[in-house]
Amino acid sequence: MIDISQKEVWFVVGSQELYGEETLRKVAEHSQIIAKGLDASSSIPVKVVYKDVVKSPSQILDVCLAANSAKNCIGIIAWMHTFSPAKMWIGGLNILKKPLCHLHTQYNAEIPWGSIDMDFMNLNQSAHGDREFGFIMSRLRKKRKVVVGHWEDQRVQKQLGIWSRVVLGWDELQNLKVARIGDNMREVAVTEGDKVEAQIRFGMSVNGYDSSDVTKHIEKVTDKQLADLLAVYESSYNLTDSLKEGGAQRSSLVEAAKIELGLRAFLEEGGFGAFTDTFENLGVWKQLPGIATQRLMADGYGFGGEGDWKTAAMVRALKVMCIGLEGGTSFMEDYTYNFTPQKSYVLGSHMLEICPSIADGKPSCEVHPLGIGGKEDPARLVFNSPAGDAINVSLVDMGTRFRLIVNEVEAVKPMAELPKLPVARVLWDCKPNLEVAATAWILAGGAHHTVYSQSITTEYMEDFADIAGIELLVIDEKTTVREFKDKINANEAYFHLFQHGL
């Protein structure tokens, strides 16, 4: 359900009429070559579209207005081939609503020592042209990503690729509809938040629906739809004997399949990209959606448990960002600890809803009791997650602003089998260690729900926070509690002043 085939970033190159026809012809020629090279890069998942060299305030304003109104344009990569007086850019940058990446490069990689002359110097001026452009961006307090290096360098293309993936996620949030099926889990604080401010800040709309809105679709499920989905379950997962045809718990799997078909139809009809539910508002549903939610997440939907719409939206955004990359992304919860004198770890899991995109093999499909909710035993996929680097991401509402918290972690193989644990899980080592990471996370007000991603890194989240204009707190191998507390205190002052325009 994630289609990025029509998405594009525009390559906009700055110059001025001063240089004359021949120089400007070469500027355009070089710019088109660079745009084609970036467009062909395997690191950049979207189209890179060359736009004409802009040489005047009116041309700059026009291209920024066009970018704002073009639905397929998700951002602009800007480069100053020559010197482009930056006062010309004020009007355009002031109205530009799309994310901007400043590429500080030049057409040639090396200086042609034997032939360099003043014609070459006048043509290749990005070393100071981009500094002029950088000044006006900073003067306007315009958040942007800056990428420095030769455009053919893999490092540069990778950074541009990361930024383009982030703006894909940002573009998704601008149009995202989140369905809250039921309300927030009663008395829970961190999953609450200002949905109006969220729509102003991120673009996403969050609205509530009753479980009966989904029940209408469940009741329309046909025998053929049901049989087809059960066949998919049987081929995709290792079903326990009790769930196979004629098994004692087969009816539970059938009911889970009905819920998936109904829930999927509800989401498709409403154009929703993310959803929440809660075990306290299930209505006539016979079980909490387990395998249904897991499979919907695997198909790209965002999800948050217990009404957690912020995490649901972020799961969706990160799933869009990581399309085509190795590794998965899932709704997650810090569940329990493994404290030892040598090393301490977190076991992440949830009641049911961990995405199989992070599974280390073919999941097992099982039915077990669920101690809360008062419903029948739900079906779910059970698996471990592979070892490797990952991040946990939490978006929280601090009252005066949104705060994004990131903890870099390393997943490890569980120290033993978990034969009696009937849920999907992942064991990780927090950076720099559990003691510092958990202290910092708690001081930051980080949620117990997170987005866990094997494919997205902190750099993505840094770019995202800049685009969104929100606070970012990173917990990594360099974090100390003292410096982290200072950062929180400094941010309180910064964001107060920034938001009041002082």
UniProtKB/Swiss-Prot annotation:
Catalytic activity: beta-L-arabinopyranose = L-ribulose
Class of this enzyme: isomerase
Keyword Manganese included in the entry's annotation: yes
Positions annotated to bind Mn(2+): E306, E333, H350, H449
Entry GO MF terms: L-arabinose isomerase activity; manganese ion binding
RNA-binding in keyword set: no
Keyword terms, alphabetized: Arabinose catabolism, Carbohydrate metabolism, Isomerase, Manganese, Metal-binding
Pfam families: AraA_central (PF24856), AraA_N (PF02610), Arabinose_Iso_C (PF11762)
UniProt cofactor note: Binds 1 Mn(2+) ion per subunit.
Listed CDD domains: L-arabinose_isomerase
One of the GO BP terms on file: L-arabinose catabolic process to xylulose 5-phosphate
Protein family per UniProt: Belongs to the arabinose isomerase family.
Its job: Catalyzes the conversion of L-arabinose to L-ribulose.
The protein, known as: L-arabinose isomerase
Organism encoding this protein: Flavobacterium johnsoniae (strain ATCC 17061 / DSM 2064 / JCM 8514 / BCRC 14874 / CCUG 350202 / NBRC 14942 / NCIMB 11054 / UW101) (Cytophaga johnsonae)
Lineage, broadest ranks: Bacteria, Pseudomonadati, Bacteroidota, Flavobacteriia, Flavobacteriales
